Design a protein with these regions (language model features):
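Noncatalytic, basic helical substrate-engagement surface that gates or grips nucleic-acid strands
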Residues: 2-139, 147-163, 167-168, 249-262, ...
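Non-catalytic nucleic-acid-binding/docking modules located in mid-to-C-terminal regions
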Residues: 50, 55-62, 166, 172-306
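Alpha-helical elements of the RecA-like P-loop NTPase motor core of helicases
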Residues: 122, 146-147, 215, 225
Length: 306
């Protein structure tokens, strides 16, 4: 298998950042009825910039999108999962850019994967696990990926997170930073979040248990299973955890990523992806700068042919 580094991009995470994390909007060049191209432009700009700045050479790049029914299984377990996220209006704006983004990836030879009944993080966990000998970088702002991190060792490569929203020099996150900042190892990160909560996924955690308390309870390599016999579940906080025990285990199951998603054959090819051109050129090749008949737009033809 290839020793070429593998970059796995959380497509929806980058898509929403491209849409809502940019102070200035980018519009088409139409004289009238200008169209907002911020999401499409910034998606490619952020993808290219992060890789160019943080990696010595272009890796194999695979962009992974959430499936349409990706969160269904977790929502069956807990109806509150991600229930705090807006579902309409402005929240749909990034999704409307998906056809053009996918077409741009196709046009410039960047692989993308979407499994209809899986979330992107589970697909990324599966792809990372499928090539343990390779160095893997996960492009995302989502801290849930911290559970996948590992240092390089005999027979296996590293897994790190690349968060390009952070300042230069601190964008690549490995196990040492997770231990320093959160007080737990990557292997215990799902246990830690089950106790302390994860607001982004609407997982409340145990009432009265914050990040520091959760880390202290798990100190020394403990897991949830080892807590009842540890002598640490004392006082009001211990009672709160004991009372919510089954719910805590359920939350951890939701936070844990699935490493066995059936991904499409050939999702990884083992060779470097050709470098992306600048975002302006991508938008130009997609025929989006100036209004055109749909049949004249490269991205429309590519999307319709799928």
């Amino acid at each position: 298998m290839s020793a070429i580094p593998l970059l796995l991009c959380d497509g929806h995470n980058l898509l929403f950042r491209a849409c809502f994390g940019t102070p200035a909007q980018i519009f088409s060049r139409d004289k009238e009825d200008k169209r907002d191209l911020t999401t499409e432009f910034m998606f490619f700009a952020l993808l290219r910039k992060g890789i160019n700045e943080e990696l010595p050479s272009w890796p194999e790049v695979v962009v992974v999108f959430d499936g349409e029914d990706g969160s269904a299984q977790r929502k069956q377990t807990d109806a509150g999962y991600k229930a705090n996220r807006p579902a309409g209006g402005e929240a749909l704006k990034p999704i409307r850019a998906l056809p053009a983004v996918k077409a741009g990836l196709d046009l410039f030879g960047v692989s993308w994967v979407e499994v209809s009944d899986a979330e992107a993080d589970d697909v990324i966990a599966t792809l990372a696990a499928s090539c343990p000998e390779r160095d893997v970088l996960i492009l995302s702002m989502d801290q849930d990926y911290y559970q996948l991190l590992r240092d390089p060792g005999l027979g296996h490569g590293s897994v790190q997170v690349l968060n390009t929203a952070r300042r230069a020099g601190s964008r690549v996150i490995g196990p040492a930073e997770v231990r320093a900042r959160h007080g737990v190892s990557p292997a215990a990160f799902a246990d830690y979040r089950a106790l302390s909560g994860d607001a982004s996924d609407n997982i409340p955690g145990v009432h009265g248990i914050g990040a520091k308390t959760a880390a202290a309870l798990l100190d020394g390599g403990l897991t949830l299973e080892s807590l009842p016999a540890s002598g640490r579940l004392t006082g009001r906080k211990g009672d709160a955890i004991t009372s919510a025990w089954q719910q805590v285990l359920s939350w951890r199951d939701m936070i844990r990523m699935n490493h066995q998603v059936p991904v499409p054959a050939g999702a990884l090819v083992g060779r470097a992806t050709a470098p992306l051109p600048g975002a302006a050129e991508v938008i130009e090749k997609l025929g989006l700068w100036n209004r055109a008949r749909p049949a004249d737009a490269v991205w429309y033809l590519n999307a319709a042919g799928r």
